[in-house]
Amino acid sequence: MSTIKKLYIKTWGCQMNEYDSSKMADLLESTHGYQLTDVAEDADILLLNTCSIREKAQEKVFHQLGRWKNFKDNKPDIIIGVGGCVASQEGEYIRQRAQCVDIIFGPQTLHRLPEMINQVKGTKSPVVDISFPEIEKFDRLPEPRAEGPSAFVSIMEGCNKYCSFCVVPYTRGEEVSRPCDDILFEIAQLAAQGVREVNLLGQNVNAYRGETFDGQICSFAELLRLVAAIDGIDRIRFTTSHPIEFTDDIIAVYEDTPELVSFLHLPVQSGSDRILTLMKRNHTALEYKSIIRKLRKARPDILISSDFIIGFPGETQDDFEKTMKLIADVNFDMSFSFIYSARPGTPAADLPDDVSEEEKKQRLYLLQQRINQQAMNYSRAMLNSVQRILVEGPSRKNVMELSGRTENNRVVNFEGTPDMIGKFVDVEIVDVYANSLRGKVVRTEDQMDLRIHESPESVIARTRKEDELGVGVYQP
């Protein structure tokens, strides 16, 4: 009698890593029958998908591997793998320092995991593959599997911008776009499984230039319109973008494509032109604000979020005040803001880290307080309004209630019935909290005038006619 083989994946970092981890799980289930478990001690394979953005990323990895080594001491056949950006950076060093590790793979080689596992089982020797094969991994992954009404789809990998503080070009490689038709086919498959909202992923999605079936190049703006035309997809989100390639043709999509949500994450990092130059961002604060003005002209109700790095080398009080002014001018809704810490191998790591930790913490506190206040103002403005939300499932606050997300990315908790999950409902916002809203259902999807979704099979069945010889003829 065969026992079920179990897989445990621990994921740190961005949505791209979350997406990669889900693909690893699907891949190893299809090739080896591994079933995901939430209990590391029960697993036959332990995979750590790492992120190198935060300070002391390496030590965090080795600390986790130290715990997993104890499992391997008790169960020698366990296979331990390390992937992600720290694996790309540290490769052989991980093997030297943590000899319990069997497999080391990068973000672009996760599709080779089945072969690596077989090799480790056969030879009992470790495998390291942190190469950058162009986009090959998407050709080797199993068909997508929906896990709710919202799904992530990777459209490109890597980044060519080489900001002075960032490790992404070194850990994920330079920009490579997936073929347009592959993306559209994956999204159509997800839509057929009930996905209503798709989030397009990439380190710099607005640099997307994917090849079409006839050898032409599809821009990001064109891709957005093509995705919006897929039957069943009612909402489109994307992350992350770089200001220097947020072009007018992308902004124009906000004017004529209602499926594209009124929420945008557009990182600026600093409001000081001097610091932006040191960061090698290749744009000014004024140019950033110009993009926002155009966006708000195209979509007046759009909300903007951003990334900010606090205490970058050389940042003065005047530089910080310029960042605070930009925050007020743009009126950001939310931010991902962090104290600067040098990433090994980046140009900024050679700059003197001359802002004290105390000053960094104080500036971060002031920045986050300002943005939290602005976010609360936006939330209060939604009080008593009716918002359309996509119901994602039970609420985290109360499993007897449901939770969904507004178009502008607000979480709403409300009383509802299980049949609402995966559908849209209109709710009146009746209360406002720091990180969520409370709503009351006023309209279900059945009462909305939404476009009718039909599968290709249903269209054929409805339009099929046979001639006198019994040959099927289809007349849409």
From Swiss-Prot:
<dbReference type="InterPro" id="IPR006463">
    <property type="entry name" value="MiaB_methiolase"/>
</dbReference>
<feature type="domain" description="Radical SAM core">
    <location>
        <begin position="145"/>
        <end position="377"/>
    </location>
</feature>
<dbReference type="InterPro" id="IPR038135">
    <property type="entry name" value="Methylthiotransferase_N_sf"/>
</dbReference>
<keyword id="KW-0479">Metal-binding</keyword>
<dbReference type="GO" id="GO:0046872">
    <property type="term" value="F:metal ion binding"/>
</dbReference>
<dbReference type="InterPro" id="IPR005839">
    <property type="entry name" value="Methylthiotransferase"/>
</dbReference>
<dbReference type="GO" id="GO:0035597">
    <property type="term" value="F:N6-isopentenyladenosine methylthiotransferase activity"/>
</dbReference>
<dbReference type="InterPro" id="IPR023404">
    <property type="entry name" value="rSAM_horseshoe"/>
</dbReference>
<dbReference type="Pfam" id="PF01938">
    <property type="entry name" value="TRAM"/>
</dbReference>
<comment type="similarity">
    <text>Belongs to the methylthiotransferase family. MiaB subfamily.</text>
</comment>
<dbReference type="InterPro" id="IPR007197">
    <property type="entry name" value="rSAM"/>
</dbReference>
<dbReference type="GO" id="GO:0051539">
    <property type="term" value="F:4 iron, 4 sulfur cluster binding"/>
</dbReference>
<keyword id="KW-0004">4Fe-4S</keyword>
<keyword id="KW-0408">Iron</keyword>
<dbReference type="Pfam" id="PF04055">
    <property type="entry name" value="Radical_SAM"/>
</dbReference>
<dbReference type="InterPro" id="IPR013848">
    <property type="entry name" value="Methylthiotransferase_N"/>
</dbReference>
<feature type="binding site">
    <location>
        <position position="51"/>
    </location>
    <ligand>
        <name>[4Fe-4S] cluster 1</name>
    </ligand>
</feature>
<dbReference type="InterPro" id="IPR006638">
    <property type="entry name" value="Elp3/MiaA/NifB-like_rSAM"/>
</dbReference>
<feature type="binding site">
    <location>
        <position position="166"/>
    </location>
    <ligand>
        <name>[4Fe-4S] cluster 2</name>
    </ligand>
</feature>
<protein>
    <recommendedName>
        <fullName>tRNA-2-methylthio-N(6)-dimethylallyladenosine synthase</fullName>
        <ecNumber>2.8.4.3</ecNumber>
    </recommendedName>
</protein>
<dbReference type="InterPro" id="IPR002792">
    <property type="entry name" value="TRAM_dom"/>
</dbReference>
<feature type="binding site">
    <location>
        <position position="159"/>
    </location>
    <ligand>
        <name>[4Fe-4S] cluster 2</name>
    </ligand>
</feature>
<dbReference type="GO" id="GO:0005829">
    <property type="term" value="C:cytosol"/>
</dbReference>
<keyword id="KW-0411">Iron-sulfur</keyword>
<keyword id="KW-0963">Cytoplasm</keyword>
<keyword id="KW-0949">S-adenosyl-L-methionine</keyword>
<dbReference type="Pfam" id="PF00919">
    <property type="entry name" value="UPF0004"/>
</dbReference>
<comment type="subunit">
    <text>Monomer.</text>
</comment>
<dbReference type="InterPro" id="IPR020612">
    <property type="entry name" value="Methylthiotransferase_CS"/>
</dbReference>
<feature type="binding site">
    <location>
        <position position="85"/>
    </location>
    <ligand>
        <name>[4Fe-4S] cluster 1</name>
    </ligand>
</feature>
<feature type="domain" description="TRAM">
    <location>
        <begin position="380"/>
        <end position="443"/>
    </location>
</feature>
<keyword id="KW-0808">Transferase</keyword>
<feature type="domain" description="MTTase N-terminal">
    <location>
        <begin position="5"/>
        <end position="122"/>
    </location>
</feature>
<feature type="binding site">
    <location>
        <position position="163"/>
    </location>
    <ligand>
        <name>[4Fe-4S] cluster 2</name>
    </ligand>
</feature>
<comment type="function">
    <text>Catalyzes the methylthiolation of N6-(dimethylallyl)adenosine (i(6)A), leading to the formation of 2-methylthio-N6-(dimethylallyl)adenosine (ms(2)i(6)A) at position 37 in tRNAs that read codons beginning with uridine.</text>
</comment>
<keyword id="KW-0819">tRNA processing</keyword>
<feature type="binding site">
    <location>
        <position position="14"/>
    </location>
    <ligand>
        <name>[4Fe-4S] cluster 1</name>
    </ligand>
</feature>
